Amino acid sequence: MSFQQTNNNATNNINSLEELAAQELIAAQFEGNLDGFFCTFYVQSKPQLLDLESECYCMDDFDCGCDRIKREEELRKLIFLTSDVYGYNFEEWKGLVWKFVQNYCPEHRYGSTFGNGLLIVSPRFFMDHLDWFQQWKLVSSNDECRAFLRKRTQLLMSGDVESNPGPVQSRPVYACDNDPRAIRLEKALQRRDEKISTLIKKLRQEIKNNRIYTQGFFDDLKGAKGEVGQLNGNLTRICDFLENSLPTLTAQIQTTVLTTTDKYVNLKEDLLKVAILLVLVRLLMVWKKYRAALIVIILFVMHFYGFDKQILDIVLDLKDKILQTTTQAGTETLEEVVYHPWFDTCGKLIFAVLAFFAIKKIPGKQDWDNYISRLDRIPKAIEGSKKIVDYCSEYFNLSVDEVKKVVLGKELKGTQGLYDEIHVWAKEIRHYLDLDERNKITLDTETAAKVEDLYKRGLKYSEEKIPDRDIARFITTMLFPAKSLYEQVLLSPVKGGGPKMRPITVWLTGESGIGKTQMIYPLCIDILREMGIVKPDAYKHQAYARQVETEYWDGYNGQKIVIYDDAFQLKDDKTKPNPEIFEVIRTCNTFPQHLHMAALQDKNMYSQAEVLLYTTNQFQVQLESITFPDAFYNRMKTHAYRVQIKQEKSIWVRNARGEEYNALDVTKLNKDEAIDLSVYEFQKMRFDDESATKWIDDGEPISYDEFARTICKAWKEEKEKTFHQLQWLEAYASRTVAQGGSETSEYYDVWDETYFSNLLSQGFMAGKSLIEMEAEFASDAETFNAYIEYKKNIPKETKWSKWMTILDEQISALSTKIRELKNKAYKFISEHPYLTALGFIGVMISAFAMYSFFERTLTDDTITSEVGSSGDNKTQKISKRVVEVGGSGDVKTTKPAKTAVEVGSSGDSKTMKNKITKVEVGSSGDSKTQKQRNTKVEVGKELEKEAETQGCSDPAAHALVLDVLQKNTYCLYYERMVKGEMKRYRLATATFLRGWVCMMPYHFIETLYARKVAPSTNIYFSQPNCDDVIVVPVSHFIAPNAERVELTTACTRIHYKDETPRDCVLVNLHRRMCHPHRDILKHFVKKSDQGNLRGVFQGTLATFHQSANELCRAYQWLQAIRPLDQEITIYHEDTDMFDYESESYTQRDCYEYNAPTQTGNCGSIVGLYNKRMERKLIGMHIPGNVSECHGYACPLTQEAIMDGLNRLEKLDPVNNITVQCCFEPPSDIKDTMSGETPEGKFCAIGKSNIKVGQAVKTTLLKSCIYGMLSKPITKPAHLTRTRLPNGEIVDPLMKGLKKCGVDTAVLDAEIVESAALDVKQVVLTQYNSMLDVNKYRRFLTYEEATQGTGDDDFMKGIARQTSPGYRYFQMPRKLPGKQDWMGSGEQYDFTSQRAQELRRDVEELIDNCAKGIIKDVVFVDTLKDERRPIEKVDAGKTRVFSAGPQHFVVAFRKYFLPFAAYLMNNRIDNEIAVGTNVYSTDWERIAKRLKKHGNKVIAGDFGNFDGSLVAQFFGQSCGKSFYPWFKTFNDVNTEDGKRNLMICIGLWTHIVHSVHSYGDNVYMWTHSQPSGNPFTVIINCLYNSMIMRIVWILLARKLAPEMQSMKKFRENVSMISYGDDNCLNISDRVVEWFNQITISEQMKEIKHEYTDEGKTGDMVKFPSLSEIHFLKKRFVFSHQLQRTVAPLQKDVIYEMLNWTRNTIDPNEILMMNINTAFREIVYHGKSEYQKLRSGIEDLAMKGILPQQPQILTFKAYLWDATMLADEVYDF
């Protein structure tokens, strides 16, 4: 019979729980389970026993009101379960006991600590049986006694023998039990035991008979007697040991030896099994051809050794553990396991083992070396390892979370996090226990709501399963004061006080019996549906029937409708007034109505009724008790109706008074309707004091449906009215200012709360009495008055103060508890660092497994992949181009013709390394960077506190704020003159949403208008280390000369759905040509996301901080961001004394948050830190409440912003089409890395993967006749960082780029537009009558843009010998320049693979421009290898050239080359000299143009022309010159027309806001244009024409106002320009105020440098034509040619002979230069020709020249110039 069956049968024979426990204790001892059961009955320490001795549990004497019978039944089940399942450990059993106590006795004083070794039975019972327990422990050590008692106990517990006959012999005895040898062995052992027992018995008898006695003189020594007696006792104990303990000890030793031997044998077998499996697994990894066979063998071995069964048993056991949810003990154990610190470590180790099988081999030393080597290249091993560890850990943590969900069945919070949360909750309770805070409960609804939430949070914490008993007890302690505060909230008037909605009063009269009461409920349902209460049974509990005869409003619980059926039936009398009359006065009012309730718990109830329904039989109400009857009728007359039956549905009847009236004819009702509402009609009644009946009909009767709609509409209007009134009152009580600063003063009180306390304490210690000290205070009246106030304010001891004291102690204890837990965790980890190391190793192996997996997946199976390069042909990888981070020296991975970048400097130009370069902490001086010794870092003082790292709650939001927003956010300033001094004021913040569209609060515009800021005042956009990068005048925002704030067409406000404007304005700055920005619109939330924005969130405010004159970024942390669905009124700053249109404005629906915002934060973007939200940006900060530290944000969604962009585009479809454009960084740019920029106004974009190199050696060489004909005046410019003669070290590239970032002027838009319109008329006029204009009004094909049209000299093919530009020059090439993509022969290549790739790049660029995406065009900044004047070279001045990529060149030519060709075919007459052949009659035409208005001319040159270009001009050039041309063959109202316009705008933007690269830095220019674009000279000419007209207008305004029109300019000035060179012919009428000197001075005012053509600085007002130079040529009339010719300066002619270039044959270039020199010198006359000829012939005769030059006669050269016969004349 099993022991479980014995227990089941013994259940009915046990009389008490104590007996059951005793029997169970015996059974547990017999089964050897004392550790599992007996210890649960035994008290941990004797002091606990004494404390519990006087107590009783509910199971014995103490009665707590629980179900005793059910409790005892559960306890029996519990004990049976424990005795049967001996595998339960103490913790599991304790959990069961805990669940029992929680279910049946949760209020017991020891309930919270039950299970920690306390008793399950009463302490009194345990004390009574303590001796028995001790004896039992001695008895149980004897085997015979144990066997005897086992049988006896089983018989006692078995009950009736007949009902339980015992076990049945169901099978025979095994043969081994009948072995005679076993019987003999057993008898021998028995005889041995008997012999030992007999010997011990005899020994005892001998000791007893022959006791040792003292003799002789020892008899008198008591000490000796004691020692002898002790010796006798020791002999007795030795016998006891031999008889009792020694056999047991011997048996235990034998058992231990046998067990150890068995375990050793089992271990050997297990090791052998594992070794066999490992060998098979290794073979499986090596022998790929025999994998199938090996798998079969492995499966057979596993089955042979029984591994398959063990695995299945483990899985089933795990499944049972997971699915076991019937007992709390199992759940709590799993929870503890999941949160055990070893869980993560074990999981990572398992993960590592799985990775081992995935790798299919044990990583060796070479594998790890190669693995680390590869990680080192991308970019370094440490960075790569960190990223992989982060990724693997993240996925592992996600897996752990899923395991927790599956195993535990719920999402569990971290215990540590929950403890911190409880700590904060307790502190909040302690905060509101203070008297000042507690008083706010009755005054502040927000405080009341917070206190109410504290109690609810406490209830939630009490339901949590918290293993720590101290924390659970702490929660229980804190719940009582939280409940007391909650009860105070319930009794607070703030829950119902304040203004209420004036109820809609409906007064229905009619004869009795027509069904007024029956009709009331359908009316209630219709009203409730209008209120939004649509539940079918809502009318039952939302309509309250009021009986006035009952004094109390019992049963009222905030119902919205109150019905007074048969009202005013009681007569009103002065002595006994009708309470209904006065209740009408109180109820129908906005003043709060405090209801009279009978129950105490219902006190403090206020009326919330919104509709009052009165039914009466007549309108005449007798009013005697009130002094002003009109007060009654004013409340009742608004909706007074007489209910009557329609004629066709009525029948005439007579009432008791003999009057006839229409009653309802029930026979005419609709049988299908339970209540037929169609029979009623409602006659509106109007109160008329002059009428006899006081009431007259008002209009025609209406049906029920119309009546119900009228009442619902009236309710809705009154509801909205009340809502607005309450909003106004709230706003009036707490005015929110538009984030203005305020001045505060600090006051100090001499007698603070500690002053008298300190004096009294000191006095008592000195022996003074209270009377004596009070007399001293009374000597001064002011001091005595303060003392009286101090006595009044002495806090009295209350229950709140007691709770405050207790809570302070509890909170302190909890803080200590949390610190101890942290210290224990830290200590555990620090003492066991190998756990962390094992976890890290697991992650590393996992990372290596992932790497191996992808390597196997992505490589060809037919070729064995190697981790590192071994040089073996069989294992060599497929040849492919490898990109290195640094040079490795490997032939296979070395980049062609590129200097690699090393971690350290090796001095090797090829950067070939034999070993991996190591990065040192300190410098060792070794070129190989090998460390000679470890560098030690000393710490002077040990840190006293431990620094803890804190992770970011939302890395995506953090990256968004730091990387994206910071490049789109600007701080705004403006300047104005104050008392003769220009002062700078901070306005606030603006954010660019995309491209040129920025967003800012609308009240900025109002502020500028109210402060009367002049339209010409500039608004400066600044960022840290980039001041005033964008400058925009106020006139761009506010229309000038407007009587109120009126936005320009470049601005629009964002609206709500109902067209209500928000405090947010969008501004398009494309007309001001500021640089474009990235598109961040996708980061704003959508409308669909707003449903998830419930509750409270955390976030940040991206703003700026001004420290002295330095601007830095600031990120304001926002607490408790929550939606606020109500209007707020925002007031302008009180300190701002300017005149606003109104003192405040309203913002509907906003986000509210707790943050100490300040002036200047307005306009900052609010971002959420929430991983569950894909999009993070929710709004823009607009106002703040400084006193309450609250801020508010205007909500923004993608839909709302897109609606605003569409509105903006419709305002000006041409100029605002750019609102859809945006900038995106190039594809190979790391925009998250901060790149460097040259000094000046540039915008950093990031770092490039491609590092651009620079030429370091010039190709210019001194010719063989250098300095022999003339003294050299030029030399090659510097191409590298150079030390100048004055000792200064100069980087010529940085010095040249600095000129492009200078500050530029902001000009009046009207002036710029006037100049642009005049230039448009000039350049678009067709002067060449032989020209077919339709030939140019088109776009080119791809082929035409590449190879040219073939029919126009100004639309030739692209020069293919020049650089292909960014990204292309890094590609392997066989031919120089662009020839790999465009071909090298006469025909251009369009079919090769490279040609097709280029075509795809061009098409992709065009598609991006069509979508408004500015992307993937980078100009490379390089130094120009040329000769410059010696003084400029010595000053370190080298010109910078910016080369464009070839795909952009093709695309730009496709859309703009025809327009450029048209301008060049109409050259000179359109003021543009581009395309001029200086040897032809073109020079004569230029001369005639410069003599049109007389002989006074000027020739000028701009200093730093490219750097001073104003971006504002570029927009006008494109808009006023190219756009009209574009419209002649494109309809912008069609889709194709809009697409083409967007393409042209995109390509133009790539020029005027070009992206540049030097080194690996990528940045954007804010103005100017790159010199390497196809339109450079044309753009400069247009700019030149515009700037001279602007100077004319500015000078005329000051000196000749009547001459400032463009008509006067054309009448008095004619000009010609080529790039930045120009010449002007000026009439005598204006030359005194418009000349070389005045123009130069005016140019300085608009930040341009304009000097004479030679840049000498010696300027005259108006030189003659023969004195000036244009394009380094003069204007000379040739009598031989009879026209004006262009002789080149003589020093330039002779200088070209001093130099040649480093080509295959430099002398060939010299001979070409000699030929060109003779053709140029002839224009200077025959004498100069003879001088040069004699010098050249002399050098030839001396053999200095490499060959004899071919020299023509003077007349022959003139003839060639006349006929343009030589190729030198062919332009």
UniProtKB/Swiss-Prot annotation:
Its EC number is 3.4.22.-, 2.7.7.48. The record marks 166-167, 190-191, 328-329, 739-740, 884-885, 908-909, 1220-1221 as: Cleavage. One of its GO terms (cellular component) is Cul2-RING ubiquitin ligase complex. Residues 106-114 are annotated as: Interaction with and inhibition of host AGO2. Residues 1495-1634 form the RdRp catalytic domain. InterPro entries: DNA/RNA_pol_sf, Helic/Pol/Pept_Calicivir-typ, Helicase_SF3_ssDNA/RNA_vir, Helicase_SF3_ssRNA_vir, PCV_3C_PRO, Pept_C3G_Picornavir, Peptidase_S1_PA, Peptidase_S1_PA_chymotrypsin. Residues 16-25 are annotated as: BC-box. The keyword Nucleotidyltransferase applies. This is Replicase polyprotein. It comes from Cricket paralysis virus (isolate Teleogryllus commodus/Australia/CrPVVIC/1968) (CrPV). The lineage of its organism: Viruses, Riboviria, Orthornavirae, Pisuviricota, Pisoniviricetes.
